[in-house]
Amino acid sequence: MSINNKEIANRVTGQVIKFIQTANDTNGELLEMESLYPLFSKEPPVHYHPHQEEYFKVLKGELTVRIGNEARVYRSGSTIQIKPGVKHSMWNEGLMDALVNWKVYPAMDTEHFLTTLTQLANTGKTNDAGVPPLPILVFLLKKYNQTFRLAKIPMGILSLMFILFNPLFKAHDYKKKFNQPLRYFLAGKNNL
C-alpha cells in the first residue's frame, strides 16, 4: 500500500513529508518525496543506508548535512548525493523552513519506516527528539536493517539486543503491530 501524494507530518520533529512517487508506483525502483525541515530543527542521529543511494535538492532555505565528521550548509539550488553505506545526518539550522526534494534508490521499505516513526511520534511514543523507547527502537532497527542503520550501534550488538528483547516483542505482539503501518496511518488508528 502506498500513500503517494499524501503527507505525513511529525508533530515532534516538525518534519513534513509528501510522497510523490512510491515503491508501488515505480516497481520498487524509486521513492521520491518532498520534505519540509522546520527552522531550528535538531540534528537527528547519524545513520546510513546499506543498500540505498539518496539524492537531495534544496528547493527552499538551507539544509545542514553531516557526512562523516564534517557538517556543511547547502542552500537553495544545491544538490547532495549520498552513496550506500555513507554515514550522515541532515537538519535545518537556518532562519526559515527548508524544502527538499528527496529521492531514494531503490525504494525498499523506506516509506513504511518513515510512516511508522511519524505515527509513533504523533501518538506520544517517542522522546522530544522523535526517538522511540529502546525496545521499540531495537525492534524497528532490526525490522528495517536493510534500509536504515544507526551509525553508533553495530549489527552484532543490535542482534544481541533483539534476542534479549524478543520475549517482550512476542508478549506485546510487535510483529503484528508493526507489520502494516501505512494501513493504520491511513485509517487514523493510534494503536502502534
Listing of model-derived features with the role each one plays in the protein:
Residues 39-41, 76-77, 85, 95:
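Tight coil/turn sites that cap or link beta-strands
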Residues 110, 118-192:
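Alpha-helical membrane-targeting segments
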Residues 10-46, 52:
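A short glycine-rich, His/Asp/Glu-containing loop-to-beta-strand
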Residues 1-6, 190-192:
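Basic/polar N-terminal segments that are highly enriched at the extreme N-terminus
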Residues 9, 55, 68-87:
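Short acidic-glycine-tyrosine-enriched beta hairpin
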Residues 51-63:
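Glycine- and acidic-residue-biased ligand/ion/polar-headgroup-sensing regions
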Residues 84-113:
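Ligand-binding loop in jelly-roll beta-barrel domains
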